[in-house]
């Protein structure tokens, strides 16, 4: 369920922002009653802007978004992952930290469909995929996100 939820959320946020998709036009799964936890570094004005995107997502999908912004995100995400209580999504401000978390099995790959979507829909798609691809705990390259 979580991999599907990650993919739905990432896909929706990316596509809706890129294309101007309205909440009424959303055709993905109904996520009513589910909560999506997101951790990131955004505070004050940046958090307010992100909250607007989250409100849009909530309206379209029926899910509730629980965003926790922190000026110590880099430390907190490591603690949360190692404790086994990570958020559903994390907005990493630096790819190196995301790569470190992937290497210990702390991230869930987005899969080939999302990787191909980014390659085909971003002007420098392959570069974005490269930036979000890291070895997993077994040393296999996986696509975890885009920046």
PLM regions: where:
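Short, well-ordered beta-strand elements
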Residues: 32-43, 63-68, 89, 144
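Short helix-initiation/N-cap motifs at beta->coil->alpha
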Residues: 69-76
């Amino acid at each position: 369920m979580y991999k599907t939820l990650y993919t739905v959320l990432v896909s929706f946020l990316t596509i809706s922002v890129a294309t101007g998709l309205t909440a009424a036009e959303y055709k993905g799964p109904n996520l009513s009653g589910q909560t999506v936890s997101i951790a990131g570094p955004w505070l004050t004005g940046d958090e307010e802007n992100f909250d607007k995107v989250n409100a849009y997502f909530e309206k379209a999908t029926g899910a509730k978004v629980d965003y926790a912004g922190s000026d110590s995100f880099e430390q907190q995400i490591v603690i949360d992952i190692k404790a086994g209580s990570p958020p559903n999504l994390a907005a990493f401000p630096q790819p190196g930290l995301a790569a470190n978390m992937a290497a210990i099995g702390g991230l869930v790959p987005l899969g080939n469909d999302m990787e191909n979507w980014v390659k085909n829909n971003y002007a420098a798609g392959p570069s974005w995929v490269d930036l979000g691809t890291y070895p997993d705990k077994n040393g296999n390259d996986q696509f975890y996100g885009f920046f």
